[in-house]
Amino acid sequence: MLHTTQLYQHVPETRWPIVYSPRYNITFMGLEKLHPFDAGKWGKVINFLKEEKLLSDSMLVEAREASEEDLLVVHTRRYLNELKWSFAVATITEIPPVIFLPNFLVQRKVLRPLRTQTGGTIMAGKLAVERGWAINVGGGFHHCSSDRGGGFCAYADITLAIKFLFERVEGISRATIIDLDAHQGNGHERDFMDDKRVYIMDVYNRHIYPGDRFAKQAIRRKVELEWGTEDDEYLDKVERNIKKSLQEHLPDVVVYNAGTDILEGDRLGGLSISPAGIVKRDELVFRMVRGRRVPILMVTSGGYQKRTARIIADSILNLFGLGLIGPESPSVSAQNSDTPLLPPAVP
């Protein structure tokens, strides 16, 4: 029997399927500055979209925090109990001083924002199926699996979103994960190792964290990149491999992990993709997936420079300008794009 969740509630048509909460952002006594991740980037993305007059607060879907019962759909109770120790959270978030904080503060200031982003991804999964597309402005914690975290990822939001859909939404039984963050997505790979319903395509720098050889066995389409890969080679490989992926396994939903740590100058990603290249990448993914009438859920994942928030906002603006997203994106897209799009589903 399914547990009662607050994450699968009806959303009025007046709201776009863009999920966000001010509670996403991590700020506490400057500790967030000790990690290269911009722990306030999610709010900056929304502010840029407001400045460009694309969105207002009344058009957004407010993310809810994932409850313990929600998390237990994927996570072991033992793992969730480990997060009650500040040492474990310090290791996962790679912020050593967290060790010295009382765990009630760690829960409130670090883990609650991550649980809220996780709830946002689960909510966006349902919205994607109903509307044809959805974006969680946070999430994409692709290094976390059911029983282990790492790489700033404490909850397995991608796995959770897919499992919620499989369990609760009729007609959703096949999923594809397109993971274009610079790092291998070893968390969801471990979770779906033996699940043939889930097809994983992963494009990543082969030389960097996590280098999880066991998890690589779950990747159905693996594209390993060299240091400093640039736009032309990257976009060509992404386009060709998405096309092949969708031919091999036509899913009922795509989860797109849209990390911006592929950006040139990102010292953790080690690739050399331009801002325009990232915008073009997202356009390619949406055009190819939506052109096949497959719902798409986008999460923002990694991105370790201050300018990534602007790039994410520019990408969302570009998707809107091309008619690939919008309040009535199927009809908008028919006018502005050469790709047929998904009609609105009945909730």
Curated annotation (Swiss-Prot):
UniProt-listed GO biological process terms: chromatin organization; epigenetic regulation of gene expression
What are the UniProt keywords, alphabetically?
A: Chromatin regulator, Hydrolase, Nucleus, Repressor, Transcription, Transcription regulation
| GO CC entries | histone deacetylase complex; nucleus; plasma membrane
**Entry annotated with the keyword Repressor:** yes
Q: What is its EC number?
A: 3.5.1.98
Subcellular location(s): the record lists: Nucleus
Primary residence: nucleus
- Any extra remark in the record? Its activity is inhibited by trapoxin, a known histone deacetylase inhibitor.
Report the protein's function: Responsible for the deacetylation of lysine residues on the N-terminal part of the core histones (H2A, H2B, H3 and H4). Histone deacetylation gives a tag for epigenetic repression and plays an important role in transcriptional regulation, cell cycle progression and developmental events. Histone deacetylases act via the formation of large multiprotein complexes.
* PANTHER family per the UniProt record, alphabetical: HISTONE DEACETYLASE 11, HISTONE DEACETYLASE HDAC1-RELATED
Q: What is this protein called?
A: Histone deacetylase 11
Species of origin reads: Homo sapiens (Human)
What lineage does UniProt assign to this protein's organism? Answer: Eukaryota, Metazoa, Chordata, Craniata, Vertebrata
